[in-house]
Amino acid sequence: MLAKRIIPCLDVRDGQVVKGVQFRNHEIIGDIVPLAKRYAEEGADELVFYDITASSDGRVVDKSWVARVAEVIDIPFCVAGGIKSAEDAARILEFGADKVSINSPALANPQLITDLADKFGVQCIVVGIDSYYDKETGKYQVYQFTGDEERTKATQWETRDWVQEVQKRGAGEIVLNMMNQDGVRNGYDIEQLNMVREVCNVPLIASGGAGAMEHFAEAYQKANVDGALAASVFHKQVINIGELKQYLKQQGIEVRL
């Protein structure tokens, strides 16, 4: 059995790490490189960096910090934000990232997933999915441009269908960002994770809602996710990654110590 992964998520805007609640009202957390280093030293299995303004601004991630991160950490990391072509992805991977993640650009051009998977291998290609539960319709909808409050919009895709579509096109891993839960810290949406897990045959990473150690255990035990991503609880030092791993081990969950 593969060890379950703990993945801190760093939202980057204008070269600094920021954090919002439900994708809004971002506050500055600090500089990228020291935070990345701290998480690697605490025992994170992997890091994810989202340039949250890149796609909505129509620009690619400013890559200078990617090389600086690669110099100070020895764990895999993934970079997302405005990657619209194989050239964009190649540049990020050359700077030292291990994976690239695409979200809004994949919705605009699903062929991009296939192009990247063919060129770099599926193991490098992560698709991020921003999923919102609409209480009125009772459906989970995929949203686009979530890094910009003014441009965020629902797409025609229901979450379950898009999960199946991106796998057909070559996604090697899926990060499910549950927008209703984001930054609220009251637990992952287990029901939604189970719905997605049923149709997801690639590694599935839960994102949005972690507030306590039990929430991580729940996602692994009740929804069989491969990894859990969190931001607020790590940035604000509510949870220490080393202690979290000891706790998970006590719960009988396989983790790398």
Curated annotation (Swiss-Prot):
Compartment(s) of residence: Cytoplasm
EC number from the UniProt entry: 4.3.2.10
GO function terms (MF aspect): imidazoleglycerol-phosphate synthase activity; lyase activity
Top-level lineage group: Bacteria
Keyword Amino-acid biosynthesis annotated: yes
Family matches, as InterPro entries: Aldolase_TIM, His_biosynth, HisF, IGPS_HisA/HisF, RibuloseP-bd_barrel
GO biological process, one term: L-histidine biosynthetic process
Function statement: IGPS catalyzes the conversion of PRFAR and glutamine to IGP, AICAR and glutamate. The HisF subunit catalyzes the cyclization activity that produces IGP and AICAR from PRFAR using the ammonia provided by the HisH subunit.
HAMAP family in alphabetical order: HisF
Family: Belongs to the HisA/HisF family.
Subunit field text: Heterodimer of HisH and HisF.
Protein name: Imidazole glycerol phosphate synthase subunit hisF1
Organism: Vibrio vulnificus (strain YJ016)
